[in-house]
C-alpha cells in the first residue's frame, strides 16, 4: 500500500508539489485574511468606541453650555437694569412731578432700549458661549484622549481654561456699555419724535423694531466693507484690538501664549460667515419671540369684536404709546430669565445653534488640532 502510494507520488511529483504549494498558499492567505479581518474589526471597534466617547463628551458639553447660559443671565439682567434704570423713573412718576412729560419721554427711550439690548445681548451670550465652550471642550477631549501618550503635554490646563473663559466679561462689561449707547441712539432716532398719545399696533411695533435693528447692525458696517461676511456685532463680544495679554509680548509665559491662541481662534470663529448667519438667525427668533410676548396685551376687546375686527390681524388692535411703554419695560424679566423661559429655550434648542456647535467641536476635537 505504501509502495504504491510512493510510486504514485514519484510519477506525479510536479503535480503534487504544485498542489502542495497551492494548498499552502491558500492556508497562509486564509490566516493572513483572518488576521487582517481581525485588525479591521478591532480598528472599527476602537473607532466606534472613540466616536461614542466623543459624542458623549459633546452632548455633555452642550448641557454645560445651556446651564452656563442660564447661570449668567441674572448677571446680564442686573448689568442692564443698572445701566438702564427705568424703575427710578417709574418711582418718580408716582409722586406726580411737574416734569411728568419729560420723565415719560425718558422712560420711553430707556424701556425700549433695555428690552432691545436684552434681546441682542442674550442672543450674543448664547452663541458666544457655544463657541467658547466647544473650543475649550475640544481641547479637553484631546487632553483626556492623549495626555501621557508619547510625552504629550496638556493643551488646556485648568488655569488657561479659567483665563480664557473669563473673556466673556467683555460682553458683560465694555461691550454691553457700547451696545447700550448704540441702541439708545437708534431708539431715540426712530421713536423719539413719536407722541406718547400716538397709537401703535403690533404690526407697527414690528416695523419700528426692524428700523432700529437696521440702524444698530449698520452702525459698524462701514468698518467691515472689506469683509461683508463678518458680523458687525463681533465688536461687542470681543474687542477689535488684540487682547491685553498680547501687550505682554515680551516674556509671555507658556500659559499666556496658549490663552492668546485660544482667543485668536475664537475671534476667527466670530468673524466667520457661519457665525454671522447663526447669530442673525437667533436675533430673528429673539425679536419674533419678543413680539409674541407683547401680543398678549394686544388682544381685541369685546367692543372690537362687536365691530367685526379680525382677531388674527396684527393691526386690529392699537394702543397708545404711553400704554405700550410698561409692556415693553417688563420684557427684560422674560428675556433674561434664569428659569428656562420660552425665549431662552427657543435659542438654546435651535437646530442652527446645535449644528454650529457640533461643527466647532468637531474642528477642535480632532487629532489634527494637536499639529497646529
Curated annotation (Swiss-Prot):
Protein keywords: Membrane, Peroxisome, Peroxisome biogenesis, Transmembrane, Transmembrane helix
Region (Interaction with PEX19): 120-136
Cellular component GO terms held in the UniProt record: cytosol; endoplasmic reticulum; peroxisomal membrane; peroxisome; protein-containing complex; protein-lipid complex
Spans through the membrane: 16-36, 117-140
GO molecular function, one term: protein-macromolecule adaptor activity
Membrane topology term: Multi-pass membrane protein
Peroxisomal compartment residues: 37-116
BP GO annotations: peroxisome membrane biogenesis; peroxisome organization; protein import into peroxisome membrane
Annotated segments matching region Targeting to peroxisomes: 1-45
Ranges of the Cytoplasmic topological domain: 1-15, 141-372
Subunit and partners: Interacts with PEX19.
Family of the protein in this entry: Belongs to the peroxin-3 family.
Function recorded in the entry: Involved in peroxisome biosynthesis and integrity. Assembles membrane vesicles before the matrix proteins are translocated. As a docking factor for PEX19, is necessary for the import of peroxisomal membrane proteins in the peroxisomes.
Name this polypeptide is given: Peroxisomal biogenesis factor 3
Annotated organism of origin: Rattus norvegicus
